[in-house]
Amino acid sequence: MNPTIFDPIALEMWYSGEANDHLLQTELENYLMNYIPSFPRKAQRKLFQTFIQGLLSPLERKSIEPIALHFSGEKYVRPLQQFFTRSPFQEQPLLDTYQTLLSKQIGAGRGMLSVDDTSFIKKGKHSAGVKRQYCGRLGKTENCQTGVFLAYAGDKGYGLVDYELYIPKEWFSEEYSALRKECHVPEEKMFASKHEIAQRMLNQILQDGRFQVQWVGCDAAYGNDHAFLDGLVLPEGVWYFAATNAKEQVFLEYPQQLFPNSKRGRPRKHPVLSSVPTSVRDVAEDPSIPWEGVVLAEGAKGPIHAERKFLRCYSCRADGNHNYVKAGDEIWLYLRKYADGEVKYFVCNAPADLPVSELDRAATLRWPIEQCFEECKSNLGMGHYECRSYRGWVRHMLFVMIAHLFATQMRESFKKKQSH
């Protein structure tokens, strides 16, 4: 690989100046050797190394053509394009290697697996899975692709773990058959909602066991979905800490089921409950349950202060198809108030004897997935891909994750050197 200046922003300024170029070049070559067995051909290995180098470089646009032109010359533009769309190598062995290295770097110690989706604005209708759909980054409906991602956060750091491109339901209709073929969407692929994709990936990673997980986290878009939460296969000692919205209802006490005698008509199928559920917003506004000031954790910029309230309650679940409800499992309700008055609501299925300090810690572990997106999009060209095919998207995201792990390793290495 040709020596070049690495992007100091991607390495958060722990690298500064050309003096470290040779050191970082050697470290990168050693790091990428872990992935070389996944590429059967020498040309593939060179193209892989070149592209990762490009993602870590200061190039303004980190897509195929600028990287090829900068590092290898014009004659390598087409080979690098074909490397993404046609080159015969499998992504799964690369992902397995990446997950193993990531787990060794950050995967120890009571961490959280978080799920979230992120969107990529696209022009036109000829990219795999593109449609007008809600784009969280813009807060409105836009023409975009959406990926579902898992991240791990623990005491040793954070990183993206797994991912999948969401293909909207209409893409599986006959109307889209030619476009599916054009974008090389796998023939065996079937529609799955974002929540189904997330649930499947979470259950696979939890079963795999490479990451030491105590928590599963998600934002309210997933936490509001009871089927998603109830379908998680959580090993012993692993619990969800899920954001929900203000309208979520809980029972403050377990309701008795009453069947009043009916003098007329058929007997009642659904019971009358002795108590009704309340919204979590009402709990937040209830003065009899006071807010408490607390230091949630020690952050990089000092203590993280917050106000919070918490209580044991019972989840509220649907009972049939006619708006009847019933009490579910006993859970924690955890509310966090920010300095601007905004309140975040969380439900958690951890046991009653769990110290509340553990809930405080869990409340700080979900933000790193947003940090991963920010670092990968701002510094590593996550959204710079120009491939329209399904395979091109999959490979670009995987290479960005591989580059992100290298940046993480180097930042930690420089931190250790500076502390001695």
Regions found by a protein language model. Name each.
Residues 67, 109-123, 150, 216-222, ...:
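Short, conserved catalytic/metal-binding motifs centered on acidic residues
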Residues 408-420:
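Conserved nucleotidyltransferase catalytic core and NTase-mimicking acidic/glycine-rich helix/loop elements
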Residues 156-183, 187, 191, 241-245, ...:
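An anionic, glycine-rich sequence signature occurring as long contiguous blocks
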